[in-house]
Structure formats: structure tokens, C-alpha cells
Amino acid sequence: MKNCWKILDIEETTDVDIIRRAYLALLPSFHPETDPQGFKQLRQAYEEALRIAQSPAKSVWQPEEYEVAEHEILLAFRALLASDSERFLPSAWQRFIQQLNYCSMEEIDELRWSLCTIAMNTAHLSFECVVLLAERLRWLQEENTGEIDEEELESFLYAIAKGNVFNFQTILHLPVAVQNDTIDFYQMFARIWSSHPQWLTLYLAQHRAVIIPDDAKLHRNLLRWYSAGRLDIPELLDYAQSWRETEPDNEDAPYYEYAQRVYCGEGESLLAELCDYWREYPSTQADALMLQWCRQHRVDYYPLLVMMIEARDLVNDQGKPLLYVPGDSARTRFHLYEILSDEKLSALGRSLVEMVLHKGRKPRISLTRDTEHTLWPLYLVAKQLVQACQPTEESLMPIVSRLDAENRCPLEALIIRRLLIQAANFTEKQTVEPEPQPQPMPVDDGGPGCLGIIKIIFYIFIFAGLIGKILHLFG
């Protein structure tokens, strides 16, 4: 065929790669179903060009001296994978698979694992598309003839079943180089998350511009990955909010919304919602968000918040608070050691932290030096609880009155309620005594014994009234 170079639209050459690229470029224009004659001529031109290239000195074809040309199905498959516009389209893959219907059973058996090998060696492969070919050729059901390593095949089929990290169709409008770079980034992202999560923060810390495809599965994964690393991704704040609104029963949705709002640095406008979330969905994750927000915006609340979290966790099987000395849990001490080095923590907060961490030793800064601090009443009650002392009515009444103050913040209200519960629980436990043994009736002579009884009755009335006020607040 003397006009093979004209059909391939290239100059005469002995470079097989140039001939093959020219053939692959023209192949989509001559489909065997829509233009069988054109496809036949193109195929003949390709084979003739290969013969000439492999033996340019000979004008007569001698087939025994040349390699057998690759099957047109394999060439069509390579062309599909190389197509910038069709490689991720299921419809294009369906058209390719229809070509297999023209092959005999013997040809299908020969092509089955060759096609699988080509797919396995393709860097950017849509599993949504290749699963169509896997089902048609029964890669999972048919016995491997040994052409492919069994473990590699099993791993490949598992990856197909798992699916891509996102739908590659969403980036087909981008330049090919950007498509490939985006796929590489997110595939590596998913690999690190599943195999080496400790490297996640380091990987995300790399400064680079990355496309975020419009894919809900990817968006949710990104929210999970970034939140796990305590990193912000402001581009997905709107999606996180819409996720919570569309799936109100999904407990993950509000967490990722509030997590991103915290890590993006939202301040006072978030506090009320965050406190409500902490009450409605108690968890260590919610605790971490509250602590992170405090450390960013109201660091002096941090020690009190740590104590509040500890008190909420220490309950019995009936959910009733246990009597304990604050600061003994390892988690509490860890959080307090973290905040001790924070320069923004006031002397008042630092003194309470040192008191909790170094029991039996006097803190370097006296708690009484900051009586003008707005949180002084709360810290005073917290100090008494840390020292295992019964809070006095004089120390409790100021924080009770703060609950009705117009300028108190939601976090302050949470802390006050928890301090009052601890104080009430402390009072109840203190009044529990062993069963008394029979004793001779004391003689009421108006002396110190009578005065002691009067004092006991007085304190019982005081604390009974205080407990009544607390119950009224929570009723």
C-alpha cells in the first residue's frame, strides 16, 4: 500500500512510535461500526507502515521477519486510555466494550488478561469505568492464566471495588496536566490517611495550589482528614453547613461544621452554638473543640473548662456525680500542663493550674491577688473544690447571681452550673455519716454542746436553701 503514509498523515519514517501515535490519533475517527471501510483502510495503512519501518531496505513484505501487529482491540483500548476527553467517561468505555462483541470466544480468552495488564499499568484510571470492563471480561471469576501476579491482581480488583477517591469526570474540563496532578494529590492523600496518618499534617503543610473537585464523597473525606489534623479548609465551610442542614440526623455533619469553624478561627459568633453542641453531643471530640476555641479566644476560661469536662465525666452508673478531688485524672493534668506554658493565661488562671498540678505546694502566685478579675468568683469556688473544702454560701452566691446577668456568656453559664452541681454534690456527701451507735443522751446544760447543735442546724438550713436554689435553676 503505497499511500499508507498519506492515510496516516505523516512523513515516511522508520520510527515505530511515531507510526503508532499517528494510528492511535486517527483511530477514534474511524470507528468499526460507523465507518468499517475507513477503519479497514486505516488498519491496513498502519500494518503496511510497520512493515516498511521494520525493513526499510526491502520493498517486498516478508511476514516471517516482522512482529505480529498488536490486536486492534488492544490498540483501541490504549487509544481510549490516552484520550483526554473520553478516558473517564463510562459511555466511551461502553462503546469500546461493544467492540468485544465482534470478537470470537478464543479472541476474548486471548485478550482478557492483556487488557487487564494494560489497565493495571495505567497511572490515572477511572475505577468507575474499568469496573465495566472487569464485569464484561469476568476478571474476578475467570482463572488467572499466570500472565499476571496473583497478589497484584487481587490488589487491583480490590482497588476497583473500593473506587476512586473522587469522580474523575468532575475534572475532565481541566487541562490534562492539571487533571493528572489533581488525581495524584488526592490519591496520595488517601494513601497516607489509610496507611500513615501520622504523616498527614506534614503532607498538608506543603504549600501548593490544589483543585477541589465538585464531589460530595471527596468533600466529606477532606473535612474528616483536615479536622483530624486540626487544620482549616475554609473552602468547604459552606458545604459543611449544607451537609448538616440536609442530614440533621447525621451526628458527623455538625461535628465537622463546628470543627472547621473553630479551626478557621471563628470567634464569639460561634460560642453559643458550640456550647449547645457540647451539651447535646457529649464526646471527647466536642471537648477538644471547646478547649481549642477557649485557647484561641478566652484562654482564662480554659482551666475552668478542663475542670468542667472532668466533672461531667466522673459519674456513677446512674449518671449521678461522684465525689472526687479535681485534677486527679491523667486527661485533666495533660490539658493543664498544655495551658501552663501559654503566655496569654492570666496570673489567676496560672495559680489555679499550679494548685491542681502541684497539690500540697503553694502556687508561686497567690489566687487572692486577682480579686478584681471578672472570673474571680468562679476561680474562688474552683479553688475550694480543688482543696477538697466545702464551698461557702458567700462564695457561691456571687456565681449564682451571675447566671441571671445579661452580660454573661454561654460558656460562663455552663461552668457555673457545673460548679454548683459539684458544690451541691459535695454538700450531700459531707452529710452522709456512718450509722450512729447508741450513746447516752447528753445533758443540755446550755454549754458548748448546745452551741454546736445550733451551729449544725444553722448550716443545714443554709445548705438546704442553697440546694433548693440550685434545683430551681436546673428545674
From Swiss-Prot:
Membrane-spanning segments: none
Q: Which residues form the J domain?
A: 3-70
Keywords in UniProt for this one? Chaperone
Domain of life here? Bacteria
Q: Know the name of this protein?
A: Uncharacterized J domain-containing protein DjlB
Origin species: Escherichia coli (strain K12)
Q: Which gene encodes it?
A: djlB
